């Protein structure tokens, strides 16, 4: 995956402000939800879905910066959540 530029993230937050960027991130998540819904209804537009995923990935970095959340902290949660997923899969 292409790395997301911390410098551009910082510039964007400095320019637009934390409040607006947080709101935009909520909107981008909603747009991804809508794109997934359309994909499920067999209205295949993989390019649009991919674009919305990219937007949300950028937003994750924005939110990490705004709320001071490290990659390591997220990694810890990912490990925990995937272990729980595996337990559920094996339990069924």
Give the residues covered by each predicted segment.
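Flexible "arm" and connector segments at domain edges
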Residues: 1-53, 57-92
């Amino acid at each position: 995956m292409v790395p997301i530029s911390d410098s551009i993230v910082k510039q964007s937050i400095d320019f637009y402000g934390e409040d607006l960027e947080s709101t935009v991130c909520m909107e981008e998540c909603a747009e991804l939800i809508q794109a997934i819904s359309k994909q499920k209804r067999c209205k295949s537009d993989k390019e649009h879905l991919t674009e919305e995923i990219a937007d949300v990935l950028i937003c994750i970095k924005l939110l990490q910066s705004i709320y001071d959340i490290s990659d390591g902290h997220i990694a810890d949660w990912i490990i925990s959540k995937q272990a729980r997923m595996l337990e559920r899969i094996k339990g069924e």
